[in-house]
Amino acid sequence: MGADCKSVAKATQVRILHLPPQVRAYFSRMPFGVDRSVVIRAEHLFGPDYARALVDRDLTTIEELVAVTPTKLRSEVRRAAGRIAELGGWIAQDSGDPVKAEQLTRRAEDHVRSADPALRAMVSMRRSNILLASDPRLAVELAADAAQLIEGRSVGRLAVSVARQRALAAIADRDRARFVAHAAHALDIAPTEPVADDHAVYANSAYVAAEVASGFIAINQPAKALDLLLGHHHGWPAGQRRDHAVASARLLRTFIVLGDYHAALDHMDVAVRGYLAAPSDRARRELRLCRRIIRDRARADQHFPLRTLRRRIEATLQGDTEP
């Protein structure tokens, strides 16, 4: 490694000394490894702004390293840069900034263009997820690209997450038949065990069930969504509090869609506690949907459960100006 590269690395080491111990391990692995779980823990501990700044600083450092790294090592550095950029995109998306998420994930695509198929598939899948609302047709194509990249390969739960993403892209593109087919496949392979260096270890059965449940609500099958959500409500690992909070808010929405307002009231405390303990844009969107449904129905129904639900959700979303 040349003198310029060493000076950048030394600057990184100096910066490590000033980091909280919970995230120091992340930088100690640079530039050739990215411990996603440590950054996610940092976000939980210090908030998304801290984690985003952490990733932005490190991405700048490693992109400087790319320019001065010998050719034979450059692919490893680019691979690490791609993983950092993808992680930054994930944090931006979960914080409600899809524009920044798209920018960072495109940078990740640039860095991993010659990487192994599994990593390229993961980045394509992530970009597909970011584009669900703004460009569902491209989201479908990117998810299909991801599936093609890993076809016939042993990639553990990444295959599960890609199948789930194909289902979400299909429903975003209003393709009911493809959604049902991809959702069935994702649920079928959801018990897959993770492999070493699995890019989607989070994609367990509870996660997949919660994700595809939103699609079943969209195609007017809320009873199916309810079965999926209740079947895994107590099966979440401790390390996925945020995903669990999203699922809990989605369960609240499902009760409301079904008109079971007493069940929704019974579940309200659980959903609110989960959201406040592990807030995310995903959970906030679920609560906004709950608010919208209740507002529409309250025009014709002023009974106690609806009034109480509306008051509780309005209080939880206090200050939120989105419709």
Residue ranges and their predicted role:
Residues 1-16:
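N-terminal export leaders
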Residues 20-323:
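Conserved binding/catalytic microenvironments
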